A protein has these predicted regions:
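Generic C-terminus detector
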Residues: 329-357
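Residue-level signal for inorganic ion chemistry
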Residues: 23, 68, 187, 284, ...
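Short beta-strand-to-turn element immediately C-terminal to the catalytic PLP-Schiff-base lysine
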Residues: 123, 152-157, 188-192, 216-218, ...
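ATP-binding N-terminal substructure of ATP-dependent carboxylate-amine bond-forming enzymes
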Residues: 1-100, 104-107
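Short, conserved charged micro-motifs
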Residues: 128-131, 160-163, 312-317, 350-357
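Phosphate-binding core of ATP-grasp and ATP-grasp-like enzymes
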Residues: 167-220, 226-258, 262-270, 278, ...
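A conserved helix-loop-beta module that forms one wall/lid of the active-site cleft
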Residues: 91-153, 158
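Short glycine-/aliphatic-rich beta-strand segments at the starts of folded cytosolic domains
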Residues: 297-308
């Protein structure tokens, strides 16, 4: 039996590209499905050019591959179910459906995985916003489709209600009580259907709702770090996870609150390529293939900086002046404002000395 596989990746962005690179290093072949022929993954894999919801193209990908995976959660789960056998998609479509809908996600996290989440309620129309205790702050989020701050409205006072009511009338939403947190953190976990590998706790700093800087290890107590890891592993085991998952959390002075999950490698885990003995992409490929997972070790404290479209030249200059920094550019042809173009990783004992772009 050939131990080298053909892996199909749905999505050819930077995550698909880095998954493909990890798979190729292990000796596997990669075919990617993406709507554009010049996507980042096209530099390292064959690409089937078709929309993500093209059932015929998904079927073609499935027919040519031993195993399928996806680089982002907005994939047509019904379309996948129609053409892919369960054994061919180890991550499954249940995880997709949970992570595509905040209502399903909150229910899973709170009631099935048994982890702490912010107090929330389901909102089906603006009527559900009547009688809010406006001494508290809330975040109204659409149940589906939101990313990088889109599809969200913070409610701090009555002045914010008209916009919130408009959002609530446009789509199903989740209303969360705002968490007064000290830090935003995340934990990457990878599973092979049985065992779970866990990465160090990451501290995340956002600018305009886009990740700007990740610091590893997160600057929280050992007790809170252990709790965050245990919660992430608890979620992974409840899911019988195959592949990599990111659990995004808030750290308060004495507790960890789970915010959301991403069923794939995550921007905040990119540091692991250089800073750990195995990256989140390595363990993702091992996980979806059902292979044994390593114990993850962090070589030294590290910082990752995102390179957005407006930062490209600044990042190139930075690496020229700091030759120990690792620059990753994803090969996107157009450097749009706030578009993720690459990242920089470097080892740093004092994260505050490393300024964001």
């Amino acid at each position: 039996m050939n131990s080298f596989k053909t892996i199909g990746i749905i999505g050819g962005g930077q995550l698909g590209q880095m998954m493909a690179i990890a798979a190729i290093y292990m000796g596997h072949k990669v075919i990617t499905l993406d709507p554009t022929n010049d996507c980042p993954a096209s530099r390292v894999s064959e690409v089937i050019v078709a929309p993500y919801d093209d059932v015929e193209a998904l079927g073609q990908l499935a027919a040519r591959c031993d195993v399928l995976t996806y680089e982002f959660e907005n994939v047509d789960a019904d379309g996948l179910d129609a053409v892919v056998s369960a054994c061919q998609l180890p991550q499954g479509t249940d995880l997709l459906r949970i992570s595509q809908n905040r209502i399903f996600e909150k229910n899973f996290l709170a009631n099935k995985a048994g982890v702490t989440v912010a107090p929330y309620k389901v909102v089906t129309s603006s009527l559900d916003l009547e009688g809010l205790d406006l001494t508290k702050t809330y975040v109204l989020k659409t149940a589906t489709g939101g990313y990088d701050g889109h599809g969200q409205k913070v409610i701090r006072s009555a002045e914010d209600l008209p916009e919130a009511q408009q959002l609530a009338n446009s789509a199903q939403c989740v209303l969360e009580e705002f968490v007064n947190f000290d830090l935003e953190i995340s934990v990457i976990v990878s599973g092979n259907g049985q065992d779970v590998a866990v990465f160090p706790v990451q501290e995340n700093i956002h600018c305009n709702n886009i990740l700007s800087k990740t610091i590893v290890p997160a600057r929280i107590s050992d007790q809170l770090a252990d709790k965050a890891k245990k919660m992430a592993v608890q979620i992974a085991k409840k899911l019988q996870l195959s592949g990599t998952l990111c659990v995004e959390m808030f750290a308060t002075a004495d507790d960890i609150i789970v915010n959301e999950i991403a069923p794939r490698p995550h921007n905040s885990g990119h540091y692991s390529i250089e800073a750990c003995d195995f990256s989140q992409f390595d363990t993702h490929i091992l996980g979806v293939l059902g292979q044994p997972l390593p114990t993850i070790h962090l070589h030294a404290p590290a910082v990752m900086l995102n390179v957005l479209g407006q930062h490209v030249q600044q990042a190139i200059d930075y690496v020229a002046q700091n030759p120990s920094a690792h620059l990753h550019m994803y090969g996107k042809l157009e450097a749009k404002h706030n578009r993720k173009m690459g990242h920089v990783t470097l080892f740093a004992e004092d994260a505050d000395e490393v300024e964001e772009f």
